[in-house]
């Protein structure tokens, strides 16, 4: 495999190597995200310390989302269920966060979360990475994606709809009307990509979705 990787870097086609990596990615998710357990965190389930990097928590600024991007599209619907169960535990504390920090309806989360329902920003003044009010709506897109692939109406009725609706309420209330009559999101930022601004692409994209 090392030789094949070396040749691949030189531009030699190797479709089997690509398939091997594809299946390896599926294996990692299968091994670290099974129904009835916690979802895959920053390191999946693989680290050799009592306290792993970044406290082995759940980073909602793209990390946990990236873990699950291939789940439904690679026919691993059941691997998404631990993530959805985890998101459900964030809703009630996330409602308090939405009201206390932003004065909105609905629920949201922030950059970091854990199994104890942590949804507020971290104790840091570095808002370029710590400020992420669209973490909740971004997580909610995974709930919709699960329904979009499975078309499980019972799931949508009993689990998905209320969670997504509450998240959409937060996103709607987060918008403010400008003097020209258009709506924008402010303050907003793209996680770990620059300062606080008005109407960043990331925030508007999540709200539209």
Regions found by a protein language model. Give the residues of each.
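Extended ligand-binding clefts on enzyme/binding-domain cores
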Residues: 17, 56-78, 90-96, 193-209
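Short, hydrophobic/amphipathic alpha-helical packing segments
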Residues: 22, 26, 164-169
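Beta-lactam-recognizing serine transpeptidase/beta-lactamase-like catalytic domain environment
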Residues: 97-106
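Alpha-helical support elements that line or immediately flank enzyme active sites
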Residues: 24, 28-31, 64-78, 133, ...
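The feature captures the catalytic groove of carbohydrate-active enzymes
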Residues: 41-57, 105-158, 166-209
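Acidic/polar, glycine-enriched structural segments that form the non-catalytic walls/loops
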Residues: 1-58, 77-98
């Amino acid at each position: 495999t090392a030789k094949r990787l070396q040749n691949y870097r030189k531009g030699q086609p190797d479709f089997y190597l690509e398939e091997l990596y594809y299946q390896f990615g599926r294996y990692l998710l299968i091994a670290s995200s099974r129904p009835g357990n916690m979802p895959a965190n920053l390191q999946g389930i693989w680290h050799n310390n009592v306290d792993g990097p970044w406290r082995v928590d759940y980073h909602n600024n793209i990390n946990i989302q990236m873990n699950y991007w291939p789940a439904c599209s690679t026919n691993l619907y059941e691997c998404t269920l631990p993530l959805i169960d985890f998101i459900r535990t964030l809703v009630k504390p996330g409602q308090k966060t939405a009201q206390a920090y932003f004065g909105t309806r609905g629920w949201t989360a922030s950059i970091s979360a854990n199994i104890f329902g942590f949804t507020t920003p971290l104790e840091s003044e570095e808002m370029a990475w710590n400020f992420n009010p669209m973490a909740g709506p971004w997580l909610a897109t995974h709930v919709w994606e699960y329904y979009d692939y499975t078309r499980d109406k019972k799931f949508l009725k009993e689990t998905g709809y209320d969670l997504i609706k509450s998240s959409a309420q937060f996103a709607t209330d987060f918008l403010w009307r400008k003097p020209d009559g258009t709506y924008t999101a402010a303050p907003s930022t793209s996680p770990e990509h620059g300062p606080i601004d008005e109407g960043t692409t990331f925030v508007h994209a999540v709200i539209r979705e």
